[in-house]
Amino acid sequence: VSNIVWGNQNLSEFLKLLKQECCDGIELAPSLIWKEPILSSSEERSSLKKKILSSGLKLVGFHSLLFSRPDLQLFKSEISRKNTITYLKDLIKLCSELGGSQLIFGSPNNRLLHGKKYEECLKQSYDDFLNLAEYCFEKKVFFCIEPLGKNLSEFIVSMSEGGELVRKVNHPNFRLHLDTKTVFTTKEDMSFIVDKYGDLIQHVHISDDDLNEPGSINKEHVNISKFLKKIEYK
């Protein structure tokens, strides 16, 4: 469960509620914990890790990685590209220190094409994601690309595009993320996705439009769960 539903207030109370509801872990949007996560002190990091573990939970990982940093753009300029990669590496290090195992890269507004051709940005991204994956290997975490529909993003707008990107980068620590809301938006065939890219799926978000309760808008969550069982996703 993500801390986005709770915000940055009363984290201890939220952790207690999750445990009462038989949840195993929490996934953090780090900028809701600290205004600038990468500037958090070692004491603050240790305190947060102890708070999560003492609640009987584990940190699954991070998402909404660049939510508070619209200035960081992967494809705008070479300087911005380098700054973005450096910042993401700092988040990878932070996630690892807190005991997390994966980082989900959605951040649609940080992967705008800025008038560049898609193929040019795609080619650039191979080196960028390989760079991040190699650092993730050192830190024992995974970096997962989150495909987003065309209504949200300009880069990697389907599970098929995400799967092909992961295969091209070809590193065990660069993996594919699946969000049920995106599958509903792109109207992709889940049977095809699972058959072709199921071995690449590292992480799944169960969500619905506008943060509504899963299943309240789209009714295909049960069918998607059947496909996930097919690839033994846990």
Where are these regions (language model features)?
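Hydrophobic faces of well-ordered beta-strands that scaffold small-molecule active sites
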Residues: 1-3, 24-28, 59-64, 103-105, ...
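Hydrophobic pocket-lining residues that define ligand/cofactor binding sites across diverse proteins
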Residues: 18, 95, 136, 228-231
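N-terminal pre-domain/capping segments
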Residues: 1-100, 171, 187
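Active-site-proximal loop/turn and secondary-structure-junction residues that shape catalytic pockets
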Residues: 5-7, 30-32, 65-68, 109-111, ...
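Active-site acidic/histidine proton-transfer and metal-coordination neighborhood
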Residues: 12-13, 53-54, 71-176, 185
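Well-ordered, non-membrane alpha-helical segments in soluble/globular domains
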Residues: 45, 125, 221-224
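Gly/Pro-rich active-site loop or hairpin
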Residues: 8, 15, 37-39, 74-79, ...
